[in-house]
């Protein structure tokens, strides 16, 4: 099933997201002191990423049935690159197997096909924690490593509707610290990770992601 977001997802309009009528705002998330400390790894210059203001709302609605059953839902975020900025225009929800604390994408060739046809970059992913807090589990970190090793700007959105202090977060692995930890870890399942040698945490909140009021996107629900 393909769902088109509103306003109209015409790519001719998407490419004009820098027009004067659009409103772009940095994503600000409260309660970040326990993750960001010391010198942010984003001292390394990263491209800005724009997401639609409707992305979180639309994904949360698509995940509602699973959330009510205490099952996770996941999706891939794909973007095009224009003038040094990534614009997320596509949300792909693959076939998947879920539990209350995990979500495994199936038939990922379908996801790759959509991305390749549209010449899009896999810049991140989004998933729910239906009954847990807003954080990145060890399994989430390994999943995200596979994105960030390809695209340094890759980010992970966690939607946690039952977390009263923070209903969502946008995260990335610290670089080089967190990336080195994950690169050298061969464990599977839920497990602790050592602290990076540079003194930073394994992951942190993103500061280069912005909500764009004029950015249109399409949703491919392949379930």
Curated annotation (Swiss-Prot):
Positions contributing to Zn(2+) 1 binding: 127, 129, 140
UniProt gene name: AMSH2
Keywords from the UniProt entry: Hydrolase, Metal-binding, Metalloprotease, Protease, Ubl conjugation pathway, Zinc
Keyword Hydrolase on entry: yes
Site (Indirect zinc-binding): 72
Cofactor binding summary note: Binds 2 Zn(2+) ions per subunit.
Lineage: Eukaryota, Viridiplantae, Streptophyta, Embryophyta, Tracheophyta
Enzyme class: hydrolase
InterPro entries: JAMM/MPN+_dom, MPN, STAMBP/STALP-like_MPN
The record's note on its domains: The JAMM motif is essential for the protease activity.
CDD domains in alphabetical order: MPN_AMSH_like
Cofactor(s) needed: Zn(2+)
Residues where Zn(2+) 2 binds: 142, 185, 191, 193
Entry's Gene Ontology BP terms: protein K48-linked deubiquitination; protein K63-linked deubiquitination; proteolysis
GO MF terms held by the record: K63-linked deubiquitinase activity; metal ion binding; metal-dependent deubiquitinase activity
Protein function: Zinc metalloprotease that cleaves 'Lys-48'- and 'Lys-63'-linked polyubiquitin chains.
Highest taxon of the lineage: Eukaryota
Protein name: AMSH-like ubiquitin thioesterase 2
Residue positions of motif JAMM motif: 127-140
Residues annotated as domain MPN: 49-177
Record-annotated membrane-spanning stretches: none
EC number(s) from the headed UniProt entry: 3.4.19.-
Assigned protein family: Belongs to the peptidase M67C family.
């Amino acid at each position: 099933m393909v769902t088109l977001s509103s306003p109209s997802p015409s790519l001719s309009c998407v490419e004009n997201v820098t027009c004067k009528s659009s409103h772009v705002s940095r994503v600000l998330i409260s309660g970040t002191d326990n993750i960001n400390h010391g010198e942010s790894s984003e001292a390394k210059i990263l491209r800005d990423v724009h997401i639609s203001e409707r992305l979180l709302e639309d994904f949360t609605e698509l995940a509602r049935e699973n959330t009510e059953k205490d099952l996770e839902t996941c999706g891939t975020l794909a973007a095009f690159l224009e003038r040094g900025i990534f614009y997320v225009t596509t949300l792909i929800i693959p076939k998947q197997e879920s539990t209350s604390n995990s979500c495994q994408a199936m038939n990922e060739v379908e996801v790759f096909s959509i991305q390749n046809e549209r010449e899009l970059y896999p810049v991140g992913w989004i998933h729910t924690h239906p009954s847990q807090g807003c954080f990145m589990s060890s399994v989430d970190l390994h999943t995200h490593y596979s994105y960030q090793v390809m695209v340094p700007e890759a980010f992970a959105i966690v939607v946690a509707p039952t977390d009263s202090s923070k209903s969502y977060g946008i995260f990335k692995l610290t670089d080089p610290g967190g990336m080195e930890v994950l690169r050298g870890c061969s464990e599977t399942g839920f497990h602790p990770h050592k602290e990076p040698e540079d003194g930073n945490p394994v992951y942190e909140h993103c500061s280069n992601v912005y909500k764009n009021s004029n950015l249109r996107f399409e949703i491919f629900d392949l379930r």
